[in-house]
UniProtKB/Swiss-Prot annotation:
Biological process annotations from GO: photosynthesis
InterPro entries listed in its UniProt record: Cyt-f_TM, Cyt_f, Cyt_f_lg_dom, Cyt_f_lg_dom_sf, Rudment_hybrid_motif
One family name in Pfam for this protein: Apocytochr_F_N
Species whose genome carries this gene: Mastigocladus laminosus
Coiled coil: none
Membrane topology according to the record: Single-pass membrane protein
Taxonomic lineage: Bacteria, Bacillati, Cyanobacteriota, Cyanophyceae, Nostocales
The protein, known as: Cytochrome f
Known partners and oligomeric status: The 4 large subunits of the cytochrome b6-f complex are cytochrome b6, subunit IV (17 kDa polypeptide, PetD), cytochrome f and the Rieske protein, while the 4 small subunits are PetG, PetL, PetM and PetN. The complex functions as a dimer.
Length: 333
């Protein structure tokens, strides 16, 4: 009996590890094959960061890991109240501005609109408010946006997206503040909030490979001897650029559908020189702000102190007028 219990204990962690690996492999397989087999819009997938960096989306340097795949820097902003009371619902507004007239390449090379995505790191204890706590007016601002935690049991780090950028250049998060009186791990004070937000597809896949939303360069120095156009079974067009080096060796660089070739046959190129334009019109941005979890008793005492100061000033004014009257009476006497 004891041996069976020991075996069960040993196999539980093994089963959990195998299950996690299978889920990760299935997820990555789905997204990579869907890019090839099922052409889709230019999307921003923040949960790729979740798969690659499962513990936290923020590096020790302070950089959000989405920047590893989204190489272009673009603005992003998060707005929150300066201070909030415990156990109250407030809104955090994430702004991801861009020119909606812009279009970029999808996985099949076609031009499509941009999607947006974001990761919002709230202080410990802060989380998305339950639906019954959200006011009706705030529900309208939030819309049909779905928020998910970055990690199971970590409700203060939130993922959202991909969402259509034309509709969601501003994303409203309904946030519930914690109550230190019921949670002893939470304390009143000032806390940091971190945002990472992107519009459009990344330039690098989590595997390190370039997406077709990137600049492709020559892998060797030499002369372009041939540019061959190929079409796969799905109708996606790509180019094979043959470069003959000075030693006579031929190197072939593959250019996927999307980027436009800026070279021609017979042209001399150097290693690292661009063979295509840069099709990327999106980018990633970070923003940091602070919020104060205010003690309501401190607010009450502050109001009482202000009232006391005002009362003291009033008494001084009355006393001054009284002294002036006495002095005037003595002068008349």
């Amino acid at each position: 009996m004891r041996n069976s219990c020991k075996k069960a204990r040993r196999t539980r962690p093994l089963k959990a590890t195998i299950q996690a690996l299978l889920v990760a492999i299935a997820t990555m397989t789905f997204f990579f094959t869907s890019d090839i087999a099922l052409p889709q819009s230019a999307a921003a997938y923040p949960f790729w960061a979740q798969q690659t960096y499962p513990e936290t989306p923020r590096e020790p340097t302070g950089r959000i890991v989405c920047a590893n795949c989204h190489l272009a820097a673009k603005p992003a902003e998060v707005e929150v109240p300066q201070s909030v009371l415990p156990d109250t619902v407030f809104k955090a507004v994430v702004k991801i501005p861009y020119d909606t007239k812009l279009q970029q390449v999808a996985a099949d090379g076609s031009k499509v609109g941009l999607n947006v995505g974001a990761v919002l790191m709230l202080p410990e204890g802060f989380k998305i408010a339950p639906e019954e706590r959200i006011p009706e007016e705030l529900k309208k601002e939030v819309g049909d946006v779905y928020f998910q935690p970055y990690k199971e049991g970590q409700d203060n780090v939130l993922l959202v997206g991909p969402l259509p950028g034309e509709q969601y250049q501003e994303i409203v998060f309904p946030v519930l503040s914690p109550n230190p009186t019921t949670d002893k791990n939470i304390h009143f004070g000032k806390y940091a909030i971190h945002l990472g937000a992107n519009r459009g597809r990344g330039q690098i896949y989590p595997t390190g490979e370039k997406s077709n939303n990137n600049v492709f360069t020559a892998s060797a120095t030499g002369t372009i001897t041939k540019i061959a156009k190929e079409e796969d079974e799905y109708g996606n067009v790509k180019y094979q650029v043959s470069i003959q080096t000075d030693s006579g060796k031929t190197v072939v660089d593959t250019i996927p559908a999307g980027p436009e070739l800026i070279v021609s046959e017979g042209q001399a190129v150097k290693a690292g020189e661009a063979l295509t334009n840069n099709p990327n019109v999106g980018g990633f941005g970070q923003d940091d702000t602070e919020i104060v979890l205010q003690d309501p008793n401190r607010v009450k005492w502050m109001i009482a102190f202000i009232c006391l100061v005002m009362l003291a000033q009033l008494m001084l004014i009355l006393k001054k007028k009284q002294v002036e009257k006495v002095q005037a009476a003595e002068m008349n006497f």
